[in-house]
Amino acid sequence: MRKIVHLSDVHFGTADPAVTELVVSKINEISPDVVVVSGDLTQRAKSIEFKQARAFLDRLPKPQIVVPGNHDVPLYNVFDRFLRKLDKFEKYITDDLTPTFIDEEIAIVGVNTARSLTIKGGRISEEQTHYIQSQLRNLSDDMLKVVVTHHPFDLPDGHDEDDVVGHAERAIHMIADCGGDVFLAGHLHVSNIETTANRYKLPNGRVALIIQAGTATSARVRGEPHSFNLIQFDNPWLRIERLECRSVADGFRPA
């Protein structure tokens, strides 16, 4: 059985130190094959926050697939926002904005959906979608094929439609056409699992999973406890479990 830990929106700068320690401990206990972080490593894209995020990642198992979120782009420094939007992310976290992991059973491809022209929105470009296709197209149908973005392809009830990643319709059809099985994201600080059938009509009746992680460590929770996802793959079975922390004393337990 293969294990993927999916966490998001750790937001160093507002991260709860006690919960952060619990996350590190639990993920190391799980000993996953891959750790996925779907963006918003910082609160305000400050160097000190990126340094804290780097130290956090260094304590987690490898390999890791890490993509930026909108909070990892400077907000108030307009010069940096437009001309050096991901310089600090690339310096402290990774300079690979299309992180990819492929072995004999799992393929995971991440892309950056954060943009300078929006405060919180994001989009996936045609070029990025073609890159994902190039990585997934010729892989075995028996493999689990995962795409990672910060902005989600679908939403829980009651959320702003603007939070759906831009160009989602085009991208999800192109990716599904080459076998995309699972779409991982964050952004809303709310856990959610949907199938693509909720929003999209894919060709040949194909259905994929859209999975969002809540915030793992940020003090700014939105109606649910700190959490992250554990994805277990034993072909053809896929199990998704949310681990949540209702109190520091309880630690992270299955929801």
Language-model segments: residues:
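Active-site neighborhood of phospho(di)ester-bond hydrolases with catalytic His/Asp-centered motifs
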Residues: 7-8, 35-40, 64-70, 112, ...
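Active-site environment of divalent metal-dependent phosphoester hydrolases
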Residues: 13-16, 43-48, 70-81, 116-120, ...
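Conserved beta-sheet core of the metallophosphoesterase superfamily
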Residues: 160-236
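Extended active-site neighborhood of metal-dependent phosphoesterases/phosphodiesterases
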Residues: 51-131, 139, 173-176, 203, ...
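A general structural motif
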Residues: 1, 32, 61, 140-144, ...
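N-terminal active-site segment of His-dependent metallophosphoesterases
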Residues: 1-59, 75-76, 131
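A short C-terminal boundary segment appended to hydrolase-like catalytic domains
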Residues: 232-255
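Short acidic, glycine-rich surface-loop motifs adjacent to enzyme active sites
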Residues: 141-156
